[in-house]
Amino acid sequence: LALEIQIDAARKINPNVQLGDSVIIPIDIQKFGRIAAQTAKQVVIQGIREAERGAAYDNYASKSQELLTGTVLRVDPTGDMFVRIGQGGEQHDAMLRLSEQIPGQTYQPGDPIRVYVIDVHRSPRGPMVQVSRTHPNVVRRLFELETPEIAEGLVEIRNIAREPGSRSKIAVRAVREDVDPVGACVGPRGGRVGAVVEELHGEKIDIVVWSEEPCEYV
């Protein structure tokens, strides 16, 4: 518990204290009754838990719109899935609702899974993390991981149209004329786009050069 104290009173405890310093005031706990001691203990524990929940919220709020790797914990009878995300002491459970799952894809507890963080909000039990497999940015983040030219800013993904589980079409453009944006995303022997297709369980990926004329995509 932090309180402000007058400098004169502080120097009665520690003669060497200066303005702005902290002073520890010893307390004789024998003067407190059992109930008061238990109450103080609960206040401290509650403060620690609130601080932990706040830190967990800040951690996952900073990961909003990121692609994370997790492990399937369980699947409810409703079809909603719970996924353990994070590493070490920063692990947390996220919800992958049935509406955010790709039709036809099934998982068992213990299976690894990549999910996209779409929302994080506070709750009395800690941060509620909502994740998705169907969001168009799942495709975007996968190509960012597989394509160095995107990570380096040489190629941009300008638009994505997606039918989750069926096909996606992405429009890309190069920042420099000597860079082939489609070839960069396809990769040598189709390795880069192939890795994305594999992660999406066979979803077809069409890659086209971006144009300001929508009719060119038809």
Kindly give the residue locations of the regions a language model identified.
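RNA-contacting regions in translation and RNA-metabolism proteins
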Residues: 1-218
